UniProtKB/Swiss-Prot annotation:
Keyword set includes Zinc: yes
GO molecular function annotations of the record: actinin binding; cyclin binding; metal ion binding; protein domain specific binding; protein serine/threonine phosphatase inhibitor activity; RNA-binding transcription regulator activity; trans-activation response element binding
Region annotation (Transactivation) ranges: 1-48
Source organism phylogeny: Viruses, Riboviria, Pararnavirae, Artverviricota, Revtraviricetes
Superkingdom of the source species: Viruses
Region Interaction with human CREBBP, annotated ranges: 1-24
Cellular component terms per the entry's GO annotation: extracellular region; host cell cytoplasm; host cell nucleolus
Chain spans, region Disordered: 48-114
Ranges for region Core: 38-48
Pfam family, one: Tat
Keyword field contains Heme: no
Protein name per the record: Protein Tat
Length: 114
């Protein structure tokens, strides 16, 4: 093992940081990219500010009227459109519902060969 300069902080030692920078991808490979990615993406732990929604004001006029029911024709059209989209996805996917391309992630540039 090579000697390390004692004046250099530990986070700047050789091999302490991954060669490829972290990204926003949540695929399995990117979740195990480094310790930070594993904690944030794999375990879902973040120490950032928690956003909480405020309760709606009861005096506001928009909150008093109930939501009108949708006509059955609109819901039928939505169902038909959703079924068509599912069929398109099944056509694009290979056997078992997996994409035909093997070993590549659609959201990052790395493939299984790397």
């Amino acid at each position: 093992m090579d000697p390390v300069d004692p004046e250099v902080p530990p986070w700047h030692h050789p091999g302490s940081q991954p060669q490829i920078p972290c990204n926003n991808c949540y695929c399995k490979r990117c979740c195990y990219h480094c310790y930070v990615c594993f904690v944030r993406k794999g375990l879902g732990i973040s120490y950032g500010r928690k956003k909480r929604g405020r309760p709606a004001a009861a005096s506001h006029p928009d909150h008093k009227d109930p939501v009108p029911k949708q006509s059955p024709t609109i819901t039928k059209r939505k169902q038909e459109r959703q079924e068509e989209q599912e069929e398109e996805v099944e056509k694009k996917a290979g056997p078992g519902g997996y994409p035909r391309r093997k070993g590549s992630c659609h959201c990052c540039t790395r493939t299984s060969e790397q």
